Structure formats: structure tokens, C-alpha cells
Amino acid sequence: MKKYLLIYALLTTCLSAWCQPKDYEWNTPSKNSSESMPCGGGDVGMNVWMEDGDILFYLSRSGSFDENNTLLKAGRFRISLSPNMDMNYFRQILHLNEGYVELTDGVISIQFWADVEKPVVHVDMTTKREALNIAVTYENWRTRDITMTKREAFQSSYKFSAPKGLLTHHDSIVAADRVLTFMHCNGEKTIFDATVTQQKMDAVKEKLHNPLKDLVFGGRMKGDGFVLMDEVTGRYASSDYKGWMYVTERPRKNANLQITLANRQGNVDAWSAQLSSVERTVRHDYDRRNTRRWWQRFWKRSYLESTGDAEQLTRNYTLFRYMLACNAKGQWPTKFNGGLFTFDPEYVNQEEEYQLSPDFRNWGGGVHTAQNQRLVYWPMLKNGDFDLLRPQLDFYLNIYKNAEERSRLYWGHEGACLTEQIENYGLPCYPEYGTKRPTGFDPGMERNAWLEYEWDTCLEFCMMALEAHRYNGMDISAYIPMIRSCLRFFDEHYQYLANQRGAKKLDGNGKLVLYPGSGGETFKGAYNSTSTIAALRSVTQALIDYENGTGRNNQADVDYLRGLLTRLPDITIRHGMIQPAILWERVQNTEPTQLYPVFPWRMYGVGRPDIDIARNTYLNDSLAVKFRSHVGWKQDVIWAACLGLTDEAEALITKKMADGPYRFPAFWGPGFDWSPDHNWGGSGMIGMQEMLLQETGSKIYIFPAWPRKWDVRFKLCASRGTTVEAEMKDGHVVNVKVIPQERQQDVVLP
């Protein structure tokens, strides 16, 4: 690559015009919920669609975990209009720039939006001509206790080890004349208690963070001029439901439906008080203006837009980013396996019939599989969506002390042992821990062929926090004890294991012996796993840099970290390629973790030393080639982009970010997980970002793996509060703008 003189004049106007995202729309009704359109904000998501003359929407909120750790929907809502829309002029529009969905025929307009500052959903209904008779029905399929089938239990944290007779407990619904209240009330005993007992942690149970006990969640529906008319029953997809129909007392030209949500641990009275408190803060017109301004500001942080062959790819990138932003204020992270936008499971995969409820998602609701979750959150750095990172970082902040209790109880040392399949209370997932365990088996270990000794994915979230500080100075002081604890676990635990085997805690070179270890779920029984070494080296050095850079460092902490660096072994290179480890016992899955030093750990890449070793690994390692794919969480496009392999990156991103199989093009899946597959979209976002912008040291590489034949404009973020806007047209870089201006000298063009 060569560095050219950049032309910066007259760039602001021509680049900024691309900040506003285009609306996405269709002009015919849908067949079923799989043809729904996402809508949301704050921590609320809706699937909105019109079917057989009715407008329907599912409503979901992050954190709505029941006793079994299923992430339950709030319900389904059905709106019927008389007179109805003229289907000849029907349009359903996602107004991206202002964050709302509209259904209209040019006369009638129904607008859905979620307040970004509080958990309130509004449906604004207007007509320019004849007044409307409006019926709104709340539909619920959990009006009685339901015994889960074996397959259905996969929506919970019991998954394949569900006890016989496991129930999804009923909701409580109170239909008053003008207001409907719905709630789910967890009892004192939940899967948390079963997990603690299973994992022999009753001795420290009272110390443990327990987010499920006495959790009450749900909401209240009301609308001016709506009164209760009838109770109805029916069946949608595979689920029977009961509904409560509210109708307008008289025809109206304007109507508003408001649904207020609340989640609270305690009792119903406390929950009801919180709900009422939120309702009192609602100021409809002000809240709508504030919400739309929030979305407008959001889109100005960054953008990607293309014409021609890549237009579909950048459009889907933008649509998926909208879905992620719907949980910007969430107390809980966006789940990789559907997020807030799952739909009826029988429409997910035509090859497998799922006669299950709308609450179903494969791989659980409260268990957060770290290898998958990380791909949802890495793209937020270059997007400049640092606030969206908080729910995921706070997830680990809230649970790491439970993981420290594991280490103390089982092994008598310090450090947070955070497993791969981890619950929202910081313990290993109940079935993955293993229900059939040999006598005397270490109670701290999972009895699972895929997950044993896989502890290093927590370090990626540690790095996200450190990178967020490096990018925009985000205050991460609350996360620093957690990061230290994660590092300390590896140092102390592998010395502990070595001491169990013999008299020495370190090898003959004074290095940790990382055995037994794991390279993802793939290289099991690994000796000095490359992915673990790369993670420990990168996070340790980044934490030292943070401590020194902020001036708040404790010298003893820095000295410890420097000592840890000296104890970390080197990654293994053989035959000119990065190896997954020195040795491993077996290959269990299809993750080529020998490429993790490229991403996420950025030890190799454009502008970095020894890139040929990493390229050789990508192109010639037999397992890396065998495992290559664009599906689901596969990361090959990221590695290709990071290594400047433009042709490879183009081929993979064309498949990865193509339209998904459902009507809304950013609903990918099910892949290896569920639909909409968020780690499919996340890995695609990362790949596109790396094709457009990479940073090595102080240098900013623009278009390092972007095909010259694809016209594109982008704005992305880099470290030190930097934003880069650039355009490629007809194979040439024609516009570049860097803020702050002093970083213009750091830009390297293709």
C-alpha cells in the first residue's frame, strides 16, 4: 500500500448526505409472522405484519425470563379496522431514520413506535376520511400451565435435560373495563436453585446474584375511548390462545394505543407501583419527538451505503444495525438466537416441523453462549454504538462475582471462572454441566465434550471494554476489577492444575502450562491453546496500557500484569502456519481457532508483521479450509478481510450479507442457532467493516479488502475519538474526511 496526498476540500456536504438511511418497505400484506417487520427501541421489540385483513404484532422485552429461564414474549396484539385499508394502495414502511413502522393506504395510517427512554409502546392510528371503528385484541397462549415437550424444553435453560413434567407456568391477566394488565410472576424457586444444588454450591447460595427469584414482568394496555367488549379464543400457527377484545366506544379519526411494560423483582404490588410510575411519565407528543430525534442522532454516528452490486449488502447491514439498536437501553444483552424478534417456530425451518409456541427459540433464553454473543457486540465499536455495548458488558459485571465463588469453593483460588455456555446468574448451563457425572469428578468442571476447559471467551468481552475506552474514552472503571479477575483465573488455575500433577507450577522456561485447555469448542484437551494465549496476551497488554494511560494505576496491579505477561507461553508456529495448540486430543467442532490471533486478537493483519504466516494458515491449513463457510457464526469473511484477501472477502460477504430466507432481508437463519440469527448478522457486519477500515498502530488503512468494482461510501469509527468518512467510486478513492484533522496524516490508501 502507498500513502497518497488526500484531498479534503468540499467533503462535508457530499459525504454527510449519505447519513440518512433509506426507508424499507413492501406493498402487500404478509402470509404469517415470518413475514413480519421489526420495530422497537429502548429495550423493546415488536414483529409487525398485516395478515388476512388484521394488523398483528408480537411484543418482546429483554429480561423477561421465567422460572425455567425461557425468554417469554409479552403477547400478541391484533388490530382490526372498519372500514379497513384499501389493499390496492397498501404500504408497510420501516422509517429507519426515525425508528418507527407505518402501515398505510394513503388515507389510514397506523404507526408503531417504542419510546427509547422508557418501556412504553405506542400505536398511533389516524384517518383522513371516514372515522374508524377499531378493535384491539390482546392474545395470550399462556393462560394455563403448559407441560413442555422434550423439544420445547430447548427454549429453557434445561434444554435436553429437562425434568419430566416441566411446566411453563401461566400468566396472570386482569381485564378491567378500560385497562388490561398482564404479568408473569416467578416464584421463589427457579432453575437457579436447581443449578446451585446440581453444582454443589448450596454453601455459598446466599452470596450469589439471582436475577430470577420473584421476578415479575408484563405490562398494561390502554387507549383513550377503548372499552372491553368480549373474550375470544382461537389458534394461531401451532398455539391455542385466549384473547381480550377492546373496541372504540364510537368511530374515531384519531386513536392511540399505549402499552407500558415493567420488570421487577419483588412482589406484584411493587411491580404494579413501578408500572404506574412509568405511566405517569408518559407525555405522548414529547416522547415521540424525543424518540425520533434519538434515532436521527443514532444514524449520524456511522453509515455504510453502496450502489450497484453491493447495494443489497450495505442495505442489510443497515437493517440489522437497526435491530441491534432496539435494545440500546437494555438491562440485558441482545440474544444471539433471535434477539427481540423471534416468530412462530413452525415458520423457521421448513425441513423441521416445530409445533411449538411463539416463545420458542433454540438454545435457550437466559443462557448466553459467549462464542455467539461476542459476534453480536464486536461491530458496535466501529459503528460508534458504544452505548449499545453496555448491556453486554454489564451482563458480565453482574455475574462475575458468582464465577469467583466457583473458583474459591471448588479450587481454593481467586479469579472468575466464566464458562462458555453461561447462565444469566454466572453458573454453567444446567444440562451442559452434565447430569450424568462419575463419582469424584471435579464439581467445578463441565462434563461436556464441547465445553470442557473452555473459559477464554470472557476475555473478548474484557477486550471490548478496553477497546471502547481506547475508541472514545468510555468510562470503564466499573469493569476493571472484572477484567483483572478474568485474567487472574487463568494464572492461578493453571498453576493450581500443574501443582496437582507435580511439584512445579510452571514449565522449565518459567511459563504457564495451559493444559488441559481448549481451542473454542473444537480443539479439545489442548496443550497451550493458541486462542487462549492470544487472548491472555492481548487483554493483559491492553489492561497495562489502560492503567498507565489513565494515570489511575495501582503499581502493584501493573507489576502483577507485567509478571503475568512473562509467564504466558508463545503461540505455536509449524510449517509456516499458526497451529491451534502444541497438541490436542481431538477435534469436536468446526471453529479454526488457529485464526483467532488474526481476529479477534489482531496479532496478525494488514500492516502487521508476519502477515504471510497468517495468510498461509488461512489459505492452506487443512482444517481452516475444510471448515470454511459463510453460514451463521462462521468468521471466515472477517479473517479474509483482516488479511487483505479481497477476492476471498468479496465471495464470502456476498453470501453472508445477501437477503435472508424470510421476507425481511436481515432476518437470517436459522444457521446453527435460530432465526433471526443475530450472530450471522454480527459476523457479517464485522467482515464488512474490516473490508473498509482497519487500524494498525497509528495507521488507518482505508479499503484494505474492498473490491474496487463496488462503489461505496462509509463513515466508521477508529481509536482516539476518530471518525473516518470515505468514498470509492469507479475504482478510485475520491473523498476522504478524517476527524480530528491531525489524524489525516495517519491514513493509508490502497
Locations of the language-model features?
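The feature captures the catalytic groove of carbohydrate-active enzymes
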Residues: 341-366, 418-480, 491-562, 734
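Sec-dependent N-terminal signal peptides
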Residues: 4-13
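Sec/Tat signal peptide C-region and signal peptidase I cleavage site
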Residues: 15-19
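Acidic/polar-rich alpha-helix caps and helix-coil junctions
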Residues: 281-318, 325-341, 387-394, 398, ...
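Non-catalytic carbohydrate-binding regions of carbohydrate-active enzymes
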Residues: 463-496, 557-585, 604-724, 728-729
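Aromatic-residue-lined binding/catalytic grooves and analogous aromatic/hydrophobic interfacial grooves
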Residues: 20-435, 533, 555-623, 719-723, ...
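Well-ordered alpha-helical scaffold segments within catalytic/enzyme domains
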Residues: 300, 323-327, 375-387, 460-473, ...
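Aromatic- and histidine-enriched alpha-helix N-cap/loop-to-helix transition segments
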Residues: 314-315, 367-372, 384, 452-460, ...
